[in-house]
């Protein structure tokens, strides 16, 4: 047995092979732009070409391009197909001419393949099958060739990359928004109200009269220093100590016309947080004139949460807050949690927060937004990075 490899054997791929030549009852009309175009019988037919015997008086040369019309008879109906052929071989002895199809359209190729395949398998070709073959897509799309001389231009690639990057950024932003919304819904508790609270002391009007402040708002006043002066009538000063003779109308009118002035002093080393009565305005006895804040008094933040957030605002819980008018985000710790009202049941909880950084007394009364975040913390990672000097 000879197992030697024959070097002359060439293996073709299936895409390079053509149908075998078959003898099929078909005719070819040679188009020569004349009314009496000759009609010849096809000797051999394949998917790549055909052969016929040239009629007398016609001579063809190799390489010549001729036009013709293939004619088939199917279900007693004629099927014609215009083709363009190139002469590849000419037998002068027998007059046989071998031609190769040129520039066949996709429908023509599909029809030829269907006729040849049906003939080889012994099936009877019907007109319905031919029409069905012409209606469907019998060819796959050409693959994209990756090369420098094909594909998109540099501008086209830039546009594609820009569009893809834009879609990616929009998708990333949408994912971030959804993640933030879900995180805030399940892991973040917001206070319904909050303010900066500082222990204050009220200074009241000793007598009825008009007021004139001596210390501006947010100004400092030492203990015993004058805060304001007031003017009142003599009648107000002597009220309660007048006898029967002093109650005469003329005497009362005289006392009312006399004015006396007095001075109010600061009861502590304080800062004037608020002035509740404007200069030159009348104030009744006992009315609160000033609210004083002890100097260097620790400021805290008071906030109100709903009772459903009971487990989120326990003493010792870390919170973050932002004071109105500031961009800085501060942190603190809840030191107490009480019911909003001591006399009845309430749906709100009042918490007191001790800030990590001291607050200025000028911030007293400002609204505060308080947030309790109970989600996974990465503070340990930040502390480790700061310790490493990153």
From Swiss-Prot:
**Function according to Swiss-Prot or TrEMBL:** Required for alginate biosynthesis.
The protein's matches in Gene3D superfamilies, at most eight in alphabetical order, are given as: predicted glycosyltransferase like domains
Annotated PilZ domain residues? 16-117
Top-level taxon in the UniProt lineage: Bacteria
Name the SUPFAM superfamilies for this protein.
Answer: PilZ domain-like (SSF141371)
Species name for this entry?
Pseudomonas syringae pv. tomato (strain ATCC BAA-871 / DC3000)
Q: Where in the cell is it found?
A: Periplasm
* Keyword Cell membrane on entry: no
Gene name, per UniProt, is alg44
Q: Which UniProt keywords apply?
A: Alginate biosynthesis, Periplasm
UniProt lists the family membership as follows: Belongs to the Alg44 family.
Its pathway, per UniProt, is: Glycan biosynthesis; alginate biosynthesis
**A GO cellular-component term linked to this record:** periplasmic space
Keyword DNA damage listed: no
Chief localisation class: periplasm
List, alphabetically, the InterPro entries matched. MFP, PilZ_domain
A Pfam match: HlyD_3
Q: Which GO BP terms, alphabetically?
A: alginic acid biosynthetic process
Alphabetically, the GO molecular function entries are: cyclic-di-GMP binding
Indicate what this protein is called per its UniProt record.
Answer: Alginate biosynthesis protein Alg44
